[in-house]
Regions:
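A short acidic, Gly/Pro-enriched loop at the edge of an enzyme's catalytic core
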Residues: 87-102
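Conserved alpha-helix/loop element of class I SAM-dependent methyltransferases that forms part
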Residues: 16-36, 46-50
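Acidic carboxylate diad motif detector
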Residues: 133-135
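A short SAM/SAH-binding and catalytic strip from SAM-dependent methyltransferases
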Residues: 100-113
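Class I SAM-dependent methyltransferase SAM/SAH-binding core
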Residues: 38-91
C-alpha cells in the first residue's frame, strides 16, 4: 500500500463512515449476525459496537495498520473477541466452511477484484451461512 492509501485513506473513511447518520445502517446490517463471523474491510472497527450478543467471535480482515490503531478504543470495549486475521479479502487465510456469517460494510467497492473476494467469502462460509453487507458502489 502506498503512503496515501495507508495513512490518509483510513482516516478519511473513519470520519466519513463514522458519522451518526450511518449508524442505523450499521445496526441493521449487523443485527442478524450470529456465531463465528468474518468481517472483510474491518477498517477502524466502526461495526464493533453493533455486533449482537449472538456473535461469538469475529475474524477481522483489514490491510491498514492505521485502521487498527483507530479501532483500539472500540476493540478494548468489545464484548466479542475480535482477532486480526488477514489483510486481503481476495485471499482469505481460512479453511473452507469456517464461518457462520460474513460482514462487509462499504468495502466491496474498494476491492480490486470483487468477484474473487465474493468467491472467497462463499468458500469460507459454512453451508447456509449468510453474507451481510451494505454498499454504495455496487
Amino acid at each position: 500500500m502506498g503512503l496515501y492509501s495507508e495513512r490518509v485513506v483510513p482516516r478519511i473513511v473513519h470520519v466519513a463512515c463514522g458519522s451518526k447518520n450511518v449508524e442505523p445502517l450499521r445496526r441493521r446490517v449487523c443485527e442478524h449476525l450470529a456465531g463465528n463471523v468474518v468481517e472483510i474491510g474491518f477498517g477502524s472497527g466502526l461495526n464493533v459496537p453493533f455486533y449482537p450478543a449472538s456473535v461469538t467471535r469475529v475474524a477481522a480482515v483489514e490491510p491498514s495498520d492505521v485502521g487498527w490503531k483507530l479501532a483500539d478504543k472500540r476493540l478494548r470495549a468489545a464484548t466479542v473477541p475480535v482477532e486480526r486475521s488477514g489483510r486481503d479479502g481476495q485471499s482469505l487465510p481460512f479453511a473452507d466452511n469456517s464461518f457462520d456469517a460474513g460482514l462487509s460494510s462499504w468495502t466491496l467497492c474498494t476491492i480490486p477484484d470483487v468477484a474473487t473476494a465474493l468467491r472467497e467469502l462463499r468458500r469460507v462460509l459454512k453451508p447456509g451461512g449468510s453474507l451481510h453487507f451494505v454498499e454504495h458502489g455496487l
